[in-house]
Each structure stands twice: as C-alpha cells, then as structure tokens.
Swiss-Prot record:
Keywords: ATP-binding, Cytoplasm, Magnesium, Metal-binding, Nucleotide-binding, One-carbon metabolism, Potassium, Transferase
Residues the record lists as binding Mg(2+): 18
Region (Flexible loop): 100-110
Protein name: S-adenosylmethionine synthase
EC number(s) from the headed UniProt entry: 2.5.1.6
Gene for this chain: metK
GO biological process, one term: S-adenosylmethionine biosynthetic process
Function: Catalyzes the formation of S-adenosylmethionine (AdoMet) from methionine and ATP. The overall synthetic reaction is composed of two sequential steps, AdoMet formation and the subsequent tripolyphosphate hydrolysis which occurs prior to release of AdoMet from the enzyme.
The record's free-text note on cofactor binding: Binds 2 divalent ions per subunit. Binds 1 potassium ion per subunit.
Recorded metabolic or biological pathway in which this protein acts: Amino-acid biosynthesis; S-adenosyl-L-methionine biosynthesis; S-adenosyl-L-methionine from L-methionine: step 1/1
UniProt organism field: Paracidovorax citrulli (strain AAC00-1)
Amino acid sequence: MANDFLFTSESVSEGHPDKVADQISDAILDAIFREDPRSRVAAETLTNTGLVVLAGEITTNAHVDYIQVARDTIKRIGYDNTDYGIDYKGCAVLVAYDKQSNDIAQGVDHASDDHLNTGAGDQGLMFGYACDETPELMPAPIYYAHRLVERQAQLRKDGRLPFLRPDAKSQVTMRYVDGKPHSIDTVVLSTQHHPDQSETATRMKASFIEAVIEEIIKPVLPKEWLQETKYLINPTGRFVIGGPQGDCGLTGRKIIVDTYGGACPHGGGAFSGKDPTKVDRSAAYAARYVAKNIVAAGLARQCQIQVSYAIGVARPINVTVYTEGTGVIPDEKIAALVQEHFDLRPKGIIQMLDLLRPIYEKTAAYGHFGREEPEFTWEKTDKAAALRAAAGL
C-alpha cells in the first residue's frame, strides 16, 4: 500500500438490527454460562418488525428463560415504544433451539485424555491485529467509528439529545501521510431520530446537524485531525424508520465492524452467540492478544497474526506472523516467540484468557477489540515484557 492514502472504516450502534441480534445471542450465552459454564452454545438470532427468532444449537444443564433474556436485551438497548417497530413488551419471540451435534461433540470432547489437547470445535482460519495508531493499539478509523456511535447512544440515553432513536451508523475516512494517521477526511454519521426532527424528506434541520456535529462528533475525534474534515450527517435527509423495522437483523453479519474495520483480513467466522470452544471466537481473541503484546513489546509497529485449525485437533495448523516490514526482528523469529509464550490450543486459550465466564454481552456492540474493559482479558499486555526480553531487546 502507498504511504499516502485514504482508508475508511465503519461502525454501527447497539440499536442497529444486526447488533440487536448479536447482543441477544450473547446475552443468552451469558445467561447460560451463569448456571453452566461448560455448556455448548451456538445461539443465532433474527430480528424483524415486532419479531425475534431464536435458533441454533445449545447443550446445557442450565434452565434459562430465553424469551425473557431477549426482551430484557431489547429493553436495555432502548426499543421500548411500539412506534419504533419493535417493543420489548409486545414483540413476538419464537424459540427453536436444538442440541449440539454428537458428531461435533465427540471431536471436541474426546480428542485426548489430556484435557489441554481437547480438539477445536471446527476448522477455520482466524486473524488478530494490532498497530500503534492509537493508545489502545487499534487502527484509528475503526476505533473512532466505534466511539462515535457509542457517544450517540450515551447522549440518547442520558437525555442530552432526546430526539435520537437507537439505530445509528458511523463511518470515518482517515488520511494517512507517510503511512501514519494525519487527518480525518470525512465523517459520516446517520442517526435515527424522532419524526419531528425532519424538516422535509430530503433535508434535515440545521439545528439537528449542528447538534450531531458539536455534541457527538467533535468531543470524540482528536481536534488536530479535524483540519478540513467533511461532515455528512443523515445524508438522505430523514432516518425515522430504523432498527429491526427498517431492516431484518441477523447474528454475525457485522464481522468487520466487530474486528478491525477492514485493516486486516478476516477468516469469515462470526463471534456472537458462540461459546469459547468455537475457535471462530476464542482463537480470534487469542490472536488479538498475541498481536497486541507483540506491538506493546516494541517488536513491531503493526502485527497481523493468522492461525488455523482442524476440527477435533488441538494444535493450530499454522501460526503466521506478518509485520509489514515494521518488525525489529524477522517475522519468523517473532512467530517462534509466539509458539514459546502462548498456548493456542483451544483449551489453552480458554485457560489463558479465562473465557468460561458470562462476559460476552458487553462485547457485542462497539467492537470486541480495543476496549479497556476489565473482562476483556485479550486486551492485556502482560506478555510484552517477556517477549521483549526473549527477543533480546
């Protein structure tokens, strides 16, 4: 990639229909884990106007009121009015869960007498990434796209911008100079609003646009990056119908939003609703943990990790490190350090990151990575010092 370029990432709010589905799926996973952390869960959710469908495969000894969990999640997000097209009190909730396939279970449960050699729950490839563009070691475009929709929700919920509704999308286009963030070229923010905020079908009131720019955007983005920034606020002019009424929502449809905003490849596996025996989730978290510690150790300015697995086999097929020429030692040597300092077998990951806990609903909006939440063990940099010492730095 050229040293001077534009790069764009997007995020969506907790009220976006796909994110509503993700949060319900992870709320159900958490509810199950509170009673039975050894459960096997693959909880999928569909949301539409006045309707939630819960389906998937769950094997558990827990007794969970799935319908109530879905309603509570919808209420927390803010869909508490029939005018929004879905209301936690009155929406229909259909439940159609089955148990995990015995064919899968035998590969995961009985791969070895050594529990650390328990096999992966599926084949697949996963990526982790970190870079020095932000203190959180995340790419700047996705990091700030998340913060914009997070602030939209905050101002909606605390009443400072009471005309906002739950659905919103953000997009940040960053200008890079010499390969580093230089300024923000364009910010797009589309936020659902009450009908009386629309002047016409094609034009928003100036006061609404000003409020969004001054109260949501400018407090979030670094002032020095807002040089000649273009602001596109509700470009269609009207955003009243949104959430599950505006679009059908599905679990696992925002995988780029959930990860790095397109700054690195994605293996294709979604996260929400999956217990950590599913390497789609746990190995992606571990790969972020590895990449972040490598950058925090000063071994590279940016780092991409790829891991891959076969179903029923514990050890990854490959662990590949790519630093795009920013590494202070060869990538092959960094990869050898990864093998030495991180246990990337599924059970090893679960132990290393303490993943058999009800911590997942919080991950399901505003990004799984780059957030300093105490539950997000994959964001720790506790291996950085050991990596640096082992590299001889």
